[in-house]
Structure formats: structure tokens, C-alpha cells
Amino acid sequence: MDYFSIIKITMITEIYFQYVIYILCFGVLLLLKSESDRLLWLHLVSILVGLIANYEMKFNVLFAMFHSAVHNLWPFLKNTGYDNTEKSVYDVICHTIMVVICYHQICYTENAVTNNYYTFHLFSVMIIIGALFNCVVSGKAIGSNDRFLHSLFEYTTIFQALSTGYWVATMLWYHHLDNIHFYSHWIIWIGLMTINWFVYKFYPNLVGISMRYKYVEAVFIVCTWYSGIISSPLIKYINVY
């Protein structure tokens, strides 16, 4: 087996190993007894990862933690679904910034998404515009009793679901954005989070369960861990020696 074949197999193993780690970390949330324990675990691991990660991944880890903090400070997602008495604007702004960060990173990665180039960029711009529109609607809905406005907000949150898939796909493969299969990986996560949005829409009680187990926060946080760890200068130093 030649050198390049070994490199390819190693890369594929690493990429799909991240999926296993991602799923196992969600399993830990099921084992922990209380919401505070789950929140503590998510943030404690994030702090440890952030301490060793490079500067780019430090920012991404911290931003995922910030998103978690926003959900706890302005909990507009309740056991019964969307609560229009709480401010959602801070969360959707956070989502929009996330998708812009990811799009920027992909655009400045050499040879990223060379296949389906125009489809990817067109869809990315549509997601960003839709997410910005959702932010505007959310801001207008603050203190408003207009049912149409609140309904419009709810339906346009699908763009934030798309931004969630965008974030997870980018963070999981942060060091492999130039991989030929990244576009397929990206489409899968966009699709999964779209399905997730429809499930929440038609079964609002599941929102309460997912919030209780910190699923909504973990989706954004856990995907940064592995990429954060392997970005560490310490890991690169160990590999050299």
C-alpha cells in the first residue's frame, strides 16, 4: 500500500470517527440526571477543549457556548413549543452570525466545494438572506400581539434550522472542508436539520423534551469538540515527536 493510500484511509477513518464521537456525546446527556448536570458537562468539556484549541477553534467553541447562554437567558422554546412572550431575536441573530462564519470559512478554504460550486453558493446566500429576514421579523415581533407576525416568525425559522445544519456540517469537518465529499456531508446535515424543524413544528411537545436534555444546545456545542482538539498546537507537537 502506497503512502497516499494510507493518508486517504487515515483521513476517511478520522472523518467518520467524528460522527461516532458526536453521537456518543449525546448519549452522555441521557445518562446525566438533571438539566444543570447536562449544562455543566457541556460547558466544562467546552472550556477544556477551548483551552487547548487554536485561536480559530477557540472562537467557535466560545460562540457555541454563547448560543447556549442565549437559550438560557431568553428561553423562548418551552415545553409546549414556541413562547412568543420571550425574546427570540438574540438567538436568531446568533444563528445568522454562525452561518456567516461558516460560509466565510468555506469560501476562504482552497479547493472547498469544487463540485456543485454554484448550487452551494446560491443556496448559502439564500440561507443567509432568509436568516436575516427571520431576524427582522423576530425584532418586529417583540411586544407585538400580531398573530400573523408571530406565525411568520415561526415559519421563517426554517432558515435557522438550515443554519444549524450548516454549522454542524462545517464544525464536524472543519479541517476537511476541501474534501471532495464535503458537499454531500453538508447536504445531509442540511436535510437532517430541516426534518428536525418539521418534527418540532408538528410535535411541539418534543421541544420541551429536547430542551430538558439540552439537545438544542448540544447540537451546536459538541460538533466543535473534536475539531477543537485536533486543532491544538499541542496535538501537532505530539504528532511531530
Curated annotation (Swiss-Prot):
<feature type="transmembrane region" description="Helical">
    <location>
        <begin position="152"/>
        <end position="172"/>
    </location>
</feature>
<feature type="transmembrane region" description="Helical">
    <location>
        <begin position="39"/>
        <end position="59"/>
    </location>
</feature>
<feature type="transmembrane region" description="Helical">
    <location>
        <begin position="89"/>
        <end position="109"/>
    </location>
</feature>
<dbReference type="GO" id="GO:0016020">
    <property type="term" value="C:membrane"/>
</dbReference>
<feature type="transmembrane region" description="Helical">
    <location>
        <begin position="215"/>
        <end position="235"/>
    </location>
</feature>
<feature type="transmembrane region" description="Helical">
    <location>
        <begin position="12"/>
        <end position="32"/>
    </location>
</feature>
<feature type="transmembrane region" description="Helical">
    <location>
        <begin position="180"/>
        <end position="200"/>
    </location>
</feature>
<keyword id="KW-0812">Transmembrane</keyword>
<feature type="transmembrane region" description="Helical">
    <location>
        <begin position="117"/>
        <end position="137"/>
    </location>
</feature>
<protein>
    <recommendedName>
        <fullName>Uncharacterized protein L68</fullName>
    </recommendedName>
</protein>
<keyword id="KW-1133">Transmembrane helix</keyword>
<keyword id="KW-0472">Membrane</keyword>
<comment type="similarity">
    <text>Belongs to the mimivirus L68/R809 family.</text>
</comment>
